[in-house]
């Protein structure tokens, strides 16, 4: 019979075991069963029998088929050193527990508590003593362990971080890999922009992530220092592939190859988690400092070296696609960055070799020299390693020429003096009165301690001073004056050149007529002047009068505090200003002018480019002939102009003249306050207007034009789309060639036109020309005032008319056409239904093909026709052709009217119920009347019979006085009897009387006659 088992928890062994479905826990009713160690053997037998049953039924995953096909299969279990096995092929192994074939190296005879399941060489072992699970696959099918279900892989969760090279990794390790890789790649990109040397360091940092490679063995390890238990999938034939793994979701889940399917071969080659691959790339990049042209080849070699490491990594990691999206993205970024790096390398200036001792412009071995331009003036000092520019060399040449001439003169004078000495020593009339002083030359005077005066009329009065040259004077302590008429009066000052002057402490004046009067000032060049404290003037006729100012270049002038003027005729007069370029001017405080004729006159202004001008406060002009005159304005581009306050002009010939305006694009113009013009030839002239698109125009206040040739001229208008036009106030045109010319009009769709005030046209070629009209749908037309046309090709031409549906037409004033091809041409008419027609005034047609032609007529129903005036046709095919009639059918197609309420008023219709009730009442009345008639007839018949009976009584004969008689009669079955008497009173007077009886009625009568 069938046996059903369930899993229970064994407290003794701390494992799950199989038990009978009827087993219960200690304590009676419970949801679990606890097995004791004493009954473990029986329970394990049941477990293994259950497992064997599952294998036989093919429900234990991929092992079922293998077990059924195996030549020798069985199970073994041991507990406390004892084993229990049965023998037989396909059953229990008699010697299975001692077989050497059990997961070699994993289970030995010394193991005391373990359960084994085997089918040929394919085995599963639960090692209780070690707390491990072992898998082994046979040699026939390869070293593959597959986990799957009916629909795909199986999720392997609770996976500890892998340690050894053949360990599986979990999601957390892969996420760490992705993060560290992305970080390394980002570092690569940043380092490339900074320098090639920092790129090497950033790439090396990639190796410290979760995936590393041993430089000597090339082995790859994943999370080598990660703690946790071990799941070992190795077998007798070495490491094996783990297959059938579902896509990992949680942090500790294993990942499968499917999740890495999106990583292309080039991407895999681009990722080098191996330290040797990264080292190769790093070495190549370092070598690129000497010859960057080889970077591409070296990088390719380094990446190719890492390819084998990636293949191993792919095998170990078992891949992922969904959960390493960021890794794939990062690698794509690497490819892009490397491509950009190669492009950048072609123009990089690099060292000739790794020693970084030489740089050859143009590349090592290139014979053609390279021009180095725009070199700033280098610092001239004993310890300076700065490069000097042509201007400094020119000044040096001039000084050298002057000094050479002076030296020639002095040598000539010295020669003459020496010749004079040979004749007479008395020719030297110099005076050296200072301690250790020296005076050489006519009237030379050295009065300072350790001073030296060398030259005619030279004077060295300062301690440790030196005066060399005719009329040279060094009066400052530690001062030096070299050159004819040179003067060094400041402490530690130096004057070098004809008529040069260094009066400031620690000042230096070099060049003919050079003057350094400020403290710590430096003047270099003919007629150069440095009068400000810590100022520097470098160049012919250069002037640095501001404190901490610098003037470099012929006629350069830096008069502002902390100002810098660089270039011929450059001027920096503002505090903290900078002028860089020929004839550049920076007069505003904190201003910067860069470029020939550049001018920055506004406070905090910046002018960059030839003839650029920034005159507004905080303004910026960037580009040839650009102008930024408004406060906080910005002009970028050739001939760009930003004259409005807070305005921005970007692009060639762009103009932003309005306050807070923005012009972006060649020839763009933003003249309105708070206006924005974006796009070539765009214009935004209205206040708060916006023009976005080539040749777009927004001239109305608060208007917006978006699209090529779009135009918004109306106040608060909006035009969106190519060639769209919104000219009406508060109008909106949306769509190519759309037009909204009416005030408050809206046109939406290609070629849509809303020309009426408050009109709305929606749909391609839709037109709304009437005031407050609405046209919706392709080719819809609403020309009447307050008209509505909704539907393709619909038309509403009457005032207050409405047409809804394709090709619907409402021509009459106040008319309504609803339905495809519906026509309402009569005034106040309504046509509802496809093909319905309401042509009569105030007529209504409801239903497909219905027709109401009579004035005030109503046709309801498919094909219904109401042609009579005030007629009504109700129902499909009904015809009302007569005036003031209601028809519910047609000739031959009459129909009943059902569910009619009982009429109340005199003109109400009555229903059959009311009619039946009336007929019944009349019938009852008729019945009553008939009874009365019958009674009357009976009475009449009786009366006739009674009267007849009276007449039948004979009269009194002549000559007789009295006659008494009886009579009888019958009329229509009614019998009567009569008694009468006649008396002759006189000859001339006669009396007659009688009574008659018929049924229940009596008739009597009397009479008298007089005869003569």
Swiss-Prot record:
| Surface exposed passenger domain: annotated segments | 72-921
Q: What is its main location?
A: other
Q: What induces it?
A: Expressed in vivo during the course of aerosol infection. Expressed at very low levels under routine laboratory growth conditions.
Residues in coiled coil = none
Signal sequence segment: 1-71
InterPro entries of this UniProt entry? Adhesin_Head_dom, Coiled_stalk_dom, ESPR, Pilin-like, Serralysin-like_metalloprot_C, YadA_C
Region Disordered: which residues?
420-746, 785-809
Cross-referenced Pfam families: ESPR (PF13018), YadA_anchor (PF03895), YadA_head (PF05658), YadA_stalk (PF05662)
Q: Note down the stretches annotated as region Translocator domain.
A: 960-1012
What SUPFAM superfamilies does its record include?
A: Adhesin YadA, collagen-binding domain, Pili subunits
State the phenotype upon gene disruption.
Answer: Inactivation of the gene substantially reduces adherence to monolayers of HEp-2 laryngeal cells and A549 type II pneumocytes, as well as to cultures of normal human bronchial epithelium (NHBE). Mutation does not affect the virulence in a mouse model of aerosol infection.
Bias kind Low complexity: ranges: 443-504, 520-588, 604-630, 646-700, 708-746
How it assembles, according to the record, is: Homotrimer.
Family per similarity comment: Belongs to the autotransporter-2 (AT-2) (TC 1.B.40) family.
Report the protein name in the record. Autotransporter adhesin BpaC
The record lists the organism as: Burkholderia mallei (strain ATCC 23344)
């Amino acid at each position: 019979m069938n046996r059903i088992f369930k899993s229970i928890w064994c407290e003794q062994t701390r494992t799950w075991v199989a038990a009978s479905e009827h087993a219960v826990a200690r304590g009676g009713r419970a949801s679990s069963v606890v097995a004791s160690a004493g009954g473990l053997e029986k329970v394990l037998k049941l477990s293994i029998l259950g497992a064997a049953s599952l294998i036989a039924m093919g429900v234990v995953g991929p092992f079922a088929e293998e077990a059924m096909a195996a030549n020798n299969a069985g199970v073994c279990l041991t507990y406390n050193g004892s084993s229990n096995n049965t023998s037989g092929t396909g059953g229990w192994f008699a010697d299975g527990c001692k077989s050497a074939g059990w997961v070699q190296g994993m289970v030995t005879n010394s193991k005391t508590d373990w359960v084994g399941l085997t089918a040929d060489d394919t085995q599963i072992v639960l090692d209780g003593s070690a707390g491990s699970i072992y898998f082994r696959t046979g040699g026939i099918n390869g070293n593959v362990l597959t986990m799957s279900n009916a629909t795909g892989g199986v999720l392997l969760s609770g996976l500890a971080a892998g340690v050894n090279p053949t360990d599986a990794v979990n999601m957390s390790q892969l996420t760490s890999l992705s993060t560290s890789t992305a970080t390394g790649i980002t570092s690569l990109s940043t380092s490339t922009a900074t320098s090639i040397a920092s790129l090497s360091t950033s790439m090396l940092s990639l190796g410290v992530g979760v995936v590393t490679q041993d430089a000597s063995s090339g082995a790859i390890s994943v999370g080598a220092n990660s703690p946790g238990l071990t799941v070992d999938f190795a077998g007798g034939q070495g490491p094996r592939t783990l297959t059938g793994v579902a896509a990992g979701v949680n942090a500790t889940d294993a990942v499968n190859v499917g999740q890495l399917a999106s990583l292309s071969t080039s991407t895999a080659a681009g990722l080098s988690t191996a330290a040797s691959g990264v080292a190769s790339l790093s070495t190549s990049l370092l070598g690129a400092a000497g010859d960057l042209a080889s970077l591409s080849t070296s990088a390719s070699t380094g990446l190719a070296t890492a390819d084998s490491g990636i293949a191993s990594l792919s095998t170990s990691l078992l891949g992922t696609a969904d959960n390493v999206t960021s890794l794939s993205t990062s690698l794509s970024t690497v490819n892009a960055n490397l491509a950009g790096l190669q492009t950048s390398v072609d123009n990089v200036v690099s060292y000739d070799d790794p020693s970084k001792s030489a740089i050859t412009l143009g590349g090592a071995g290139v014979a053609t020299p390279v021009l180095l331009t725009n070199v700033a003036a280098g610092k001239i000092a004993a310890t300076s390693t700065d490069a000097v520019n042509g201007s400094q060399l020119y000044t040096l040449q001039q000084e050298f020429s002057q000094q050479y001439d002076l030296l020639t003169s002095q040598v000539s004078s010295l020669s003459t003096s020496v010749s004079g000495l040979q004749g007479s020593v008395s020719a030297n009339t110099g005076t050296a009165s200072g301690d250790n002083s020296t005076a050489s030359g006519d009237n030379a005077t050295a009065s300072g301690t350790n001073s030296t005066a060398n030259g005619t009329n030279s004077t060295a009065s300062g301690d440790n001073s030196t005066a060399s040259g005719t009329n040279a004077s060094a009066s400052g302590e530690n001062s030096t004056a070299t050159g004819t008429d040179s003067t060094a009066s400041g402490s530690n000052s130096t004057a070098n050149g004809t008529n040069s002057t260094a009066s400031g402490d620690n000042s230096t004046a070099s060049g003919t007529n050079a003057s350094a009067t400020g403290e710590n000032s430096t003047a270099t060049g003919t007629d150069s002047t440095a009068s400000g404290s810590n100022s520097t003037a470098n160049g012919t006729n250069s002037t640095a009068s501001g404190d901490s100012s610098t003037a470099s270049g012929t006629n350069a002038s830096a008069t502002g505090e902390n100002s810098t003027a660089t270039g011929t005729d450059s001027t920096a007069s503002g505090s903290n200003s900078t002028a860089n370029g020929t004839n550049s001017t920076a007069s505003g405080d904190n201003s910067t002018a860069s470029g020939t004729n550049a001018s920055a006159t506004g406070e905090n202004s910046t002018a960059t480019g030839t003839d650029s001008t920034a005159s507004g406060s905080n303004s910026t002009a960037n580009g040839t002939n650009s102008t930024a005159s408004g406060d906080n304005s910005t002009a970028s581009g050739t001939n760009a102009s930003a004259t409005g306050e807070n305005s921005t002009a970007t692009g060639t010939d762009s103009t932003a003249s309005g306050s807070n305006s923005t012009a972006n694009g060649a020839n763009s113009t933003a003249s309105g306050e708070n206006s924005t013009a974006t796009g070539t030839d765009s214009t935004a002239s209205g206040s708060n207007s916006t023009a976005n698109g080539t040749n777009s125009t927004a001239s109305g206040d608060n208007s917006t034009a978006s699209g090529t040739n779009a135009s918004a001229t109306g106040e608060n208008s909006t035009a969106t789309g190519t060639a769209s036009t919104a000219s009406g106030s508060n109008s909106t045109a949306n769509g190519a060639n759309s037009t909204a010319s009416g005030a408050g009009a809206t046109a939406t769709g290609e070629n849509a036109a809303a020309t009426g005030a408050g009109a709305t046209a929606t749909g391609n070629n839709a037109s709304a020309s009437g005031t407050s009209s609405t046209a919706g749908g392709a080719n819809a037309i609403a020309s009447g005032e307050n008209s509505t046309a909704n539907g393709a090709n619909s038309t509403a031409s009457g005032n207050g008319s409405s047409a809804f549906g394709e090709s619907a037409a409402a021509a009459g004033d106040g008319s309504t056409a609803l339905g495809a091809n519906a026509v309402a041409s009569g005034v106040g008419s309504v046509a509802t239904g496809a093909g319905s027609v309401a042509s009569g005034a105030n007529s209504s047609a409801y239903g497909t093909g219905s027709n109401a032609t009579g004035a005030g007529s109503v046709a309801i129903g498919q094909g219904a026709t109401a042609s009579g005036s005030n007629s009504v046709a109700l129902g499909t095919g009904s015809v009302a052709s007569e005036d003031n009639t209601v028809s519910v059918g047609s000739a031959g197609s009459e129909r009943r009217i059902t569910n009619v309420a009982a009429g109340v008023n005199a003109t109400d219709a009555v229903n059959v119920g009311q009619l039946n009730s009336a007929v019944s009442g009349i019938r009852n009345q008729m019945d009553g009347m008939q009874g009365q008639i019958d009674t009357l007839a009976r009475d009449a018949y009786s009366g006739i019979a009674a009267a007849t009976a009276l007449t039948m009584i004979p009269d009194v004969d002549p000559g007789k006085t009295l006659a008494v008689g009886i009579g009888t009669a019958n009329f229509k079955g009614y019998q009567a009897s009569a008694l009468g008497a006649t008396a002759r009173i006189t000859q001339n007077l006669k009396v007659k009387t009688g009574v008659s009886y018929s049924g229940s009625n009596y008739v009597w009568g009397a009479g008298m006659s007089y005869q003569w």
